[in-house]
């Protein structure tokens, strides 16, 4: 019996518990027209664990913290569903690069470079916000 046993807050504060390793989260990905449908396989009936994001956003999310990439497993269910290769995501490539055209003979490239302005404007208007702020600052600076 310790001095702090009368106060449960202090007892829990000073008790040391061994951390359990985090379980591997299995994610199901279905690529469709430049967007990826992601859902957790652990709860297939729960729709709240489902999301649709773009290829580029998926690559950005998974490459933001490379230390956590080992905790993500990409699983494939079904013949017609395409899943993302984790190595491609590390490099920032999109998943629909491997898609074939209608005649199934030629590959079409649907990838964008990270500096492509069309892709940048399509998913984020950050550049226009930067331009507005810089214009506003220069206007305020010369107003004096």
Curated annotation (Swiss-Prot):
Q: Name one GO cellular component term.
A: autophagosome
One molecular function GO term is: ribosome binding
User: Which biological process terms from the Gene Ontology are attached to this UniProt entry?
Assistant: autophagy
Listed name of the protein: Putative uncharacterized protein YBR285W
Q: Which organism is it from?
A: Saccharomyces cerevisiae (strain ATCC 204508 / S288c)
């Amino acid at each position: 019996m310790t001095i702090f046993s009368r106060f449960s807050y202090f007892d829990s504060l000073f008790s040391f518990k061994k951390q359990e390793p985090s379980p591997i989260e299995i994610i199901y990905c279905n690529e469709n027209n430049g967007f990826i449908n992601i859902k957790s396989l652990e709860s297939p009936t729960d729709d709240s664990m489902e999301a649709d994001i773009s290829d580029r956003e998926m690559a950005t999310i998974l490459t933001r913290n490379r230390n956590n990439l080992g905790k993500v497993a990409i699983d494939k269910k079904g013949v017609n569903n395409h899943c993302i290769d984790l190595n491609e995501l590390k490099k920032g490539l999109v998943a629909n690069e491997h898609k074939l055209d209608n005649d199934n003979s030629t590959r079409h490239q649907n990838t964008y470079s990270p500096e492509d302005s069309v892709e940048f404007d399509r998913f984020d208007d950050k550049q226009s916000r930067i331009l507005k702020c810089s214009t506003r600052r220069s206007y305020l600076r010369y107003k004096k």
